[in-house]
Amino acid sequence: MKALEVRIRKARKSDIDRIIDIERSWQHLSHWSIDSYYRLLNDDSFTSSFVAELEEESGSNSIVGFVIFHIAADVSEIYNIAVESGHARSGIGKQLMTAAIEESARRKARKVILEVRKSNNPAINFYLGFTFTIAGERKNYYSNPIEDAYVMELDISD
């Protein structure tokens, strides 16, 4: 049996329902409206997004993860990154983050920033693995439940 192959590609509007399904499956993510996703996917000049698509032996493809980020001037901000729970810790998140960092560098960003719930240790450790550092905090940044956020950043100026 052939192993499953993951392909990272630019997200399309037709992917929004699947992106929302993945996002909604994780409690720690801020849940966006469908209109927010349409606005972001229509803004190619500043916002980029990728999906991870499994190419299965049967020939069917399924989206199992996504990353959405915004580049303005020399800063790229990761808005959201998630992988379907059944594929967590499989390396797909790493592929998505690598694609976002590479695209940010290609578009002349000098650093990547993001916010993460202070209690989300798996995500914090994931970002530390990319050598993000904790640059600050935002008090009461998240709601449902109210929680502070770490601001993390990665220098990609080299």
Regions found by a protein language model. Give the residues of each.
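Conserved glycine-rich acetyl-CoA-binding loop
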Residues: 80, 84-98, 105-107, 111, ...
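Generic structural signal for residues in well-ordered beta-strands
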Residues: 6-8, 132
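Residue-level detector of high-confidence beta-strand sites
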Residues: 66, 135-137
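Acetyl-CoA-dependent GNAT
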Residues: 10-86, 97-99, 103, 107, ...
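Non-catalytic, surface-exposed connector residues within folded enzymatic/regulatory domains
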Residues: 31, 90-91, 146
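Short, conserved catalytic or adaptor-binding loops enriched in Gly and charged residues
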Residues: 1-3
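C-terminal "cap" of GNAT-fold acetyltransferases
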Residues: 49, 110, 117-121, 130, ...
